[in-house]
């Protein structure tokens, strides 16, 4: 191998195709490139392209891409240096020159960043131990009731009141780092030191952190990358002060305590705050991570999939407030769509806002007991949609739609049936077989690319609900999803939705309101509702016919006179769209017809909004 003289030359020598194949990913030739199942999301149809000419990979579903080094970084969740070394090893490239030269130029900055933070962790921990207890240790042990073991486990430290005076001299004389720390590295970023940490202001001579408990934050591999400082004084307006955002410290890409999780864990608890993590840890729940915000990023999902390979269940245990409840529903949908079983802690109108409050009020036993009170997917969703005021039919449809997004669940017949049983029991709606059939139909409507196959996966039912009689289990047969199936299925789905009795024309959500409209109200009420979706004049004629024959409101009669599915909707529009895409042979993409059919759904939404508006006008 010729020693490279530029970064581009080094990357050219690290070929992408053999690196991808090293991870047992099968490449299939497609033109000049290769395609493969993407390892970074639940890919059922090859959506990752590997370009030999460009020496890169790109997934057009999850948008992950890059060169060979980036691929290793993503799949192994390692830093650039480790990925480079592994790439050279995979390709049997002897390039000590490349390692020495380029790691000095690129990677040492990141390594230095970690080393500086390690020194800071050590410094703040030492401060906590050396300063009088009332400066910080008393706050942790008495006010926050944390044990010495928890304090040590999380490397908690203290930025004491005199940091303005002692911070710089202490760090500049810190002996366990080479080369020695420079003042500019600790101050705010400059042109010479763009990676400076921002812990001291040279102009004002003020330390960024003082009178705060310092909580070290690590990246997903356990390297220290930042801090969050918890104010000790109640008068301090800013309760938590974090390290400045940096290319290596992006809160949205981090999970507090992730690097300490048992990599063979089956269940992971997801909470909001640092002290919530401390509360669960104090109660003996070690596999708990804290969100650095209220959202999960793609890097979080990849970390779950790549580093927690045995993970089956994520328990959402966010705060018991409006923001926590809203975030729970969003996170549930995201995790569920990635094939993760989701449970939700049942706060059950508890008086406490979060785990820290519960821990301080009732202790670790109460925390541990609460972690065992969880709702499964269906139990949570039924309760959630009830708070939104949805009736049983709408709730069933929404719950089944969410279940159908999880291919791991729908591939397990027993678990799917169990969830349908729970849904029927909670709502006393329909019957189990009907709901199960609806779920099977809905899972086929989940968006897929041109051709894919659903196959039976390893059973998960027993691990969740115990051993049961599985005699009724039927092994799933592969179902080929073709272009014709997609078009036909989506057309039928759209047609059913626009013709459904409760959203058809102006029937929508309030049948009685429409029936009670007098003939004199019709012209004014519907005059402005001209849309290409239906024939307004024909609707008015039908309504007048009803009032001419019937003097008392009667929905059944009104419905029959209206003619339901034949009165006003131009069915030929949908039929033409269906025929167009079935006959279309070039440049076919499943999303093409979706945009056209979505037009009709948007009109339905518009009808609902208009109905609500006009109803309010009539009532007032």
UniProtKB/Swiss-Prot annotation:
Mg(2+) 2 binds at residues 319, 321. Keywords: DNA replication, DNA-binding, DNA-directed RNA polymerase, Magnesium, Metal-binding, Nucleotidyltransferase, Primosome, Transcription, Transferase, Zinc, Zinc-finger. One of its GO terms (biological process) is DNA replication, synthesis of primer. Pfam families: DNAG_N, Toprim_2, Zn_ribbon_DnaG. GO terms for molecular function: DNA binding; DNA-directed RNA polymerase activity; zinc ion binding. Contains an N-terminal zinc-binding domain, a central core domain that contains the primase activity, and a C-terminal DnaB-binding domain. This is DNA primase. The lineage of its organism: Bacteria, Bacillati, Mycoplasmatota, Mycoplasmoidales, Mycoplasmoidaceae.
């Amino acid at each position: 191998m010729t020693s490279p003289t530029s970064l581009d030359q080094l990357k050219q020598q690290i070929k992408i195709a053999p690196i991808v194949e090293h991870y047992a990913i099968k490449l299939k030739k497609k033109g000049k490139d290769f395609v493969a199942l993407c390892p970074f999301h639940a890919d059922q149809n090859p959506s990752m392209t590997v370009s030999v000419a460009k020496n890169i990979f790109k997934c057009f579903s999850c948008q992950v891409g890059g060169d060979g080094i980036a691929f290793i970084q993503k799949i192994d969740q390692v830093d650039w240096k480790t990925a480079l070394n592994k790439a050279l090893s995979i390709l049997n490239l002897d390039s000590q020159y490349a390692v020495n030269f380029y790691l000095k130029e690129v990677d040492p900055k990141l390594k230095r960043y970690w080393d500086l933070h390690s020194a800071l962790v050590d410094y703040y921990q030492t401060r906590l131990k050396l300063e009088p207890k009332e400066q910080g240790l008393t706050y942790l042990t008495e006010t926050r009731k944390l044990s010495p073991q928890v304090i040590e486990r999380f490397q908690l430290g203290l930025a004491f009141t005199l940091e303005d005076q002692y911070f710089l001299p202490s760090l500049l004389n810190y002996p366990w780092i080479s080369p020695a720390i420079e003042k500019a590295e600790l101050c705010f970023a400059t042109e010479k030191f763009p990676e400076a940490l921002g812990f001291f202001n040279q102009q004002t001579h003020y330390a960024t952190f003082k009178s705060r408990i310092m909580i070290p934050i690590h990246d997903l591999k356990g390297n220290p990358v930042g801090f969050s400082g918890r104010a000790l004084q109640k008068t301090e307006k800013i309760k938590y002060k974090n390290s400045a955002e940096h290319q290596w410290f992006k809160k949205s890409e981090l999970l507090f305590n992730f690097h300490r999780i048992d990599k063979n864990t089956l269940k992971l608890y997801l909470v909001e705050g640092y002290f919530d993590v401390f509360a669960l840890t104090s109660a003996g729940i070690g596999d708990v991570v804290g969100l650095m915000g209220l959202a999960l990023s793609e890097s979080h999902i990849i970390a779950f999939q790549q580093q927690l390979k045995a993970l089956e269940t994520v328990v959402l245990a966010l705060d018991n407030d409006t923001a926590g409840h809203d975030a729970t529903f969003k996170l549930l949908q995201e995790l569920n769509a990635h094939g993760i079983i989701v449970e939700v802690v049942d706060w059950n109108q508890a008086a406490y806002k979060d785990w820290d409050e519960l821990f301080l009020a009732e202790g670790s036993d109460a925390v541990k007991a609460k972690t065992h009170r969880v709702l499964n997917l269906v139990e949570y969703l039924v309760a959630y949609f009830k708070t939104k005021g949805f009736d049983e039919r709408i709730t069933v449809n929404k719950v089944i739609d969410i279940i159908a997004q999880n291919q791991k669940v729908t591939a397990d017949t027993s678990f799917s049936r169990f969830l349908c049983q729970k849904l029927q029991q909670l709502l006393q709606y329909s019957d189990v077989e009907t709901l199960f059939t609806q779920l099977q139909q809905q899972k086929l409507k989940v968006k897929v690319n041109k051709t894919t196959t659903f196959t039976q996966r390893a059973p998960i039912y027993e691990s969740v609900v115990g051993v049961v009689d599985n005699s009724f289990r039927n092994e799933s047969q592969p179902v080929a999803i073709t272009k014709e199936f997609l078009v036909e299925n989506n057309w039928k789905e759209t047609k059913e939705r626009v013709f459904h009795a409760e959203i058809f024309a102006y029937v929508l959500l309030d049948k009685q309101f429409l029936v009670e409209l007098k003939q004199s109200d019709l012209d004014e009420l519907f005059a402005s509702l001209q849309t290409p979706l239906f024939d307004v004049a024909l609707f008015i004629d039908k309504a007048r016919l009803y009032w001419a024959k019937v003097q008392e409101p009667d929905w059944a009669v009104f419905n029959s006179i209206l003619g339901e599915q034949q009165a006003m909707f131009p069915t030929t529009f949908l039929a033409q769209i269906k025929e167009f895409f079935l006959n279309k042979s070039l440049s076919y993409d499943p999303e093409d017809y979706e945009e056209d059919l979505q037009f009709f759904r948007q009109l339905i939404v518009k009808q609902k909004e208009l109905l609500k508006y006009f109803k309010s006008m009539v009532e007032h």
